[in-house]
Amino acid sequence: MSNFQFAIPTIDYIRILPEIVLAVFGIVVMMADALIPQNNSKKPLGYLSLIGVLVSLGAIACQARYPGMYDVNNGTGFWGMVHVDSFSLFFHVLIALITAAVLLVSFEYMDVQRMRSGEYYAIILFSALGMMLMTSATELVLIFIALEISSIGSYVLAAMRRRVAESAESSLKYFLLGSFATAFFLYGVALIFGATGSTNVYTIAAALQNMHPLQPIIYLAVALMFIGLGFKVAAAPFHVWTPDVYEGAPSPIVALMSTGPKAAAFAVLLRVLFAMNAPGWFWIVWVSAALSMTIGNIGALVQSNVKRLLAYSSIAHAGYMLVAFAAAKDAGISAAIFYTATYAAMNVGAFAVVSHFANTGEKYVTLEDYAGLGRRSPLLAAILTVFLLSLIGIPVTGGFFAKFYVFTSALQSHLVWLTIIGVINSAVGAYYYLRIIVYMYMRDEREEVPVARMPFGLALALAMCLMFTIYLGVLPTQFINYALKSAQDLVR
């Protein structure tokens, strides 16, 4: 009789330490919620959740310093299902910072909207857990599980404004369409497994290299997986849910779902397309990038609701990121990483301002409501202006170098037409961002719209986003070098 032993090496737990921290704090928050009376403020649970995110950042720092963590041969854990490298650590830190900023914005929002749901904070932590696990998973089944953890949390968070019909409607649309998209991804995984006999990204890559000729089913599998992940990043033509969901969901949650899941899904796309060396992906990405930029910018031109405008803007920016994907070289991958981080900072900041200005019931969300904001609240208007200029790509902001890096990498890969489409769309996009600025500084308000005092949590979140946006616009070299190292770690 053979002696069968089932043991997980200690280092494996270190590889998922940030996720373990978030899971523990999420459970603690739910237990603590049961001890707080229903009608009391749940802000203490928000503070506890923020502590959990900070502890997870400490766990990420421990991962980065752990001996042998980056070793190519021993760099995986849980039998090759999880891999921690510069690439995954970068996205872990990014997701943790996004989550921290959203929690800071949520403190005020929950009180102003009179939402007494303690599970709100726990679900944010569990969603962040799923996003982090997506970025380090090298097993397609584990990626699917992490994707579902993140998605289910997002569906629930979108419906947190329970008494508002638009919120329930947006959540239902998100759930139904998200379920279809996930089914496409899972079917693609099943086809890949049927063709290669594995669901491990690196094992699949080796199998595809030895498969001559490639089975046609491989191309179908890659297309199906791209559909599933394209939905998560709000790339055209899988974008139809975005405006309605962003309009109906709570503004802090829109800040989260427009950046966190997008960053995690882009990380998975990078790992699946490049590390797996998936065939047939180039033209899929090319077409989706062109459609996303064009549909997103044209759709935003006719919007009067700021949340819907930023939703279409999010679709357009997904297109810019996909331009970097199409470039396919180290420079293209690093440009996609750099753009993802820059976009997260400026978009979270923009939605933080929208969340604060919307007031009780999210009443003030139209362009007319922003008229005269420069006189009524000069600081808030100035901060929003910086984020909008960065979204345009004006110099001295992170958005400028992000777009410059993306288009440069595309030209280096001879993607001339895609670059031309991107530049034209950037010029079109400048119109609707400047339109908001014109309303804030050059239009008189039709009625007095109140602007509440900026609370400390919101001020801290805005300061984080503002400093990061300006830092990447003034001193981007160090960050670009790290993005390049992350790209090299991914494809080595």
UniProtKB/Swiss-Prot annotation:
This is NADH-quinone oxidoreductase subunit N 2. The keyword Lyase does not apply. Belongs to the complex I subunit 2 family. Pfam families: Proton_antipo_M (PF00361). The chain crosses the membrane at residues 16-36, 44-64, 87-107, 118-138, 140-160, 175-195, 216-236, 250-270, 282-302, 309-329, 333-353, 381-401, 416-438, 455-475. NDH-1 shuttles electrons from NADH, via FMN and iron-sulfur (Fe-S) centers, to quinones in the respiratory chain. The immediate electron acceptor for the enzyme in this species is believed to be ubiquinone. Couples the redox reaction to proton translocation (for every two electrons transferred, four hydrogen ions are translocated across the cytoplasmic membrane), and thus conserves the redox energy in a proton gradient. Its EC number is 7.1.1.-. InterPro entries: NADH-Q_OxRdtase_suN/2, ND/Mrp_TM. The keyword Metal-binding does not apply. It is an enzyme of class 7 (translocase). The gene is nuoN2. GO terms for biological process: ATP synthesis coupled electron transport. Its main location: membrane. It is a multi-pass membrane protein. It is found in: Cell inner membrane. One of its GO terms (molecular function) is NADH dehydrogenase (ubiquinone) activity.
